[in-house]
Amino acid sequence: METQALPGGRRMTASDTNIPVRLAPANRNRSYMQMCWVVPDLDAAIRHWLDSTGAGPFFVFEDVHFTESHYRGTPMDVAPHRAAIGQHGDMQIELICPVGDHPGIWRDVVPGGGFGFHHVGLYCDDYEAERAAYLSTGAQMAFEGLMMGARTCYIDTVPTLGFMTELITRNPVADMVFGQFRTAAEGWDGRDPVRTLG
């Protein structure tokens, strides 16, 4: 991504605060609600987050699938993985542990066996508008499908932001599940740190 040139050919720096920037339209969602890391060992990663940050409790998902899904234009389910999500304040912390070294969105960002930041998540009132806005910038669709009965996608914003951006359609099932994460974290006393949904 090119930096804006100033008079005399000088490149814009952080100190050039008087130069207006192009903001996203006012109706765009600007509040990230999730951060995700790809990890080589899910159980160890959960323990590190519990011990180091107090996030949690974490809810573990062992067999995650999408329907009507495409990976970079080819019909394909999401690459096999285990996952865990815990609440940390207003932010969901998601941990993804790929199973095997299958091609897909996890390995696109974090090569086999590695550890690293993967994506931020946005919960969208107007999924189609958010999707179109990201794609209009030249970003590519990495993966899209149905999860919990609602459209979800991963936009490849790695070239410009260094990570992917997940868009999730706001829907009653996700409201219930996300509410369970938040409720479990409120006043949590440390008991039952690793759970399953139910």
Report the location of each language-model feature.
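Glyoxalase I/VOC metalloenzyme domain signal
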Residues: 2-33, 37-59, 74-140, 156-198
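A short, aromatic/hydrophobic, helix- or strand-capping loop or linear motif
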Residues: 60-64, 144-148
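Short, charge-patterned binding micro-sites
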Residues: 65-70
